[in-house]
């Protein structure tokens, strides 16, 4: 249809084999470089490395390309957010009362695991609540990664710049929906 797009793509919802390729630490590039970088060997304490966004291109089909980016800075940000959510989950565990299950992807209660205790195999009436270390590790593997799908042929660095401006576009839509006020318009025909 002739339209060009750059859209976010969930790494968590990809097929297992595609996700393994996307999260493989090899074959990333730094902007302006033709050499491949293994991101697992990066010295993220180096300020320049910390500020750099690395990328890899993965052809999806003849028209689409998946661009996976990795940012040590974004990784640190996501870890800090999750760490505060884990602390909030621990507070829920430490406080007496009903334990609740996390209903949305950012709810700290999603890190709380409910285990039934029963020796006879009957339905247990007693539960043990604990931090779900498996869930925490599962989410940690995506730290620093972001993916977009595009049908634009061109330099992946330009596509990354388009995606970096995405938050500004989203912010403008939020303003339009929440803060923009207009008076009603009445249209009247002469006949």
Predicted regions and their residues:
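Anion-binding and metal-coordination hotspots
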Residues: 1-191
């Amino acid at each position: 249809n002739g339209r060009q797009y750059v859209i976010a793509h969930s790494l968590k919802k990809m097929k297992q084999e595609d996700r393994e390729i996307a999260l493989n630490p090899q074959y990333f590039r730094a902007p302006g470089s033709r050499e491949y970088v293994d991101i697992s060997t990066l010295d993220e304490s180096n300020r320049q490395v910390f500020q750099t966004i690395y990328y890899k291109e993965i052809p999806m089909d003849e028209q689409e390309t998946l661009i996976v980016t990795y940012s040590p800075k974004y990784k640190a940000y996501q870890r800090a957010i999750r760490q505060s959510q884990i602390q909030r989950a621990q507070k829920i565990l430490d406080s007496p009362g009903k334990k609740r299950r996390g209903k949305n992807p950012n709810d700290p209660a999603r890190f709380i695991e409910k285990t039934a205790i029963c020796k006879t195999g009957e339905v247990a009436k007693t539960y043990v609540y604990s931090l779900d270390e498996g869930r925490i590790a599962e989410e940690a593997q995506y730290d620093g990664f972001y993916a977009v799908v595009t049908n634009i042929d061109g330099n992946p660095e330009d596509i990354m710049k388009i995606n970096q401006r995405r938050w500004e576009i989203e912010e403008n839509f939020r303003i339009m929906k929440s803060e923009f006020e207009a008076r009603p318009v009445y249209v009247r025909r002469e006949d």
